[in-house]
Amino acid sequence: MVKKNIVVLTGSPRAGGNSDQMADALIRGAEQAGHLVTKISTAQLNVQGCVACMGCYSSADRPCCHNDDFNRIAPLIERADVVVFAAPLYWSTFPAAIKRVIDNFYCFYHGGRAVAGKRAVLLSCGEDTAYNMFDGIQRAYELILPVLGWSNAGMILAPGVNDPGDVQKTDALKRCEALGKTL
């Protein structure tokens, strides 16, 4: 098997929370399969939102005109074979911290960077018990992929998960670890 370079972007402001545990389970499986994994907590980053200035890669050493942490993580994302989005559901979509990072993916698109061919994974959890609560985040994820030329490698959604540790009462962690092994 070929070793994959995997970047896991977590979006929860709650370190060790349910979506973080989902990410960690996927990472465990991926590492057991021999893959190299880098976990990035977007809530700990200083990333400005895209302001549509069209200054993407106007400086060879900076993907974004903002002097922020996106410029540090962009090369990791560019080199990745797989990008994982792990986030709790906030108002039916991605939380602000990971959304700012995703918005800055425009740098890759506008800057003409060769990022096509990657695979992506969505891991998400939310308080409601109905699966349709994930419609917003799932649709956003599905719309991002073709723009970047990425394909879906899997999606694990865990409803009924809100309080710290609730995800441990579901089969989501087992499914995340199994998915990590298949990447």
Question: What is each PLM-predicted segment?
Answer:
Residues 96-97, 109-154:
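Short, glycine-/small-residue-rich phosphate/pyrophosphate-handling segment
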Residues 1-86, 90-111, 157, 165-183:
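N-terminal beta1-alpha1-beta2 submodule of the flavodoxin-like/Rossmannoid cofactor-binding fold
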Residues 160:
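Active-site rim beta-loop-alpha module in soluble metabolic enzymes
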Residues 131-132, 163-165:
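Short active-site-adjacent structural elements
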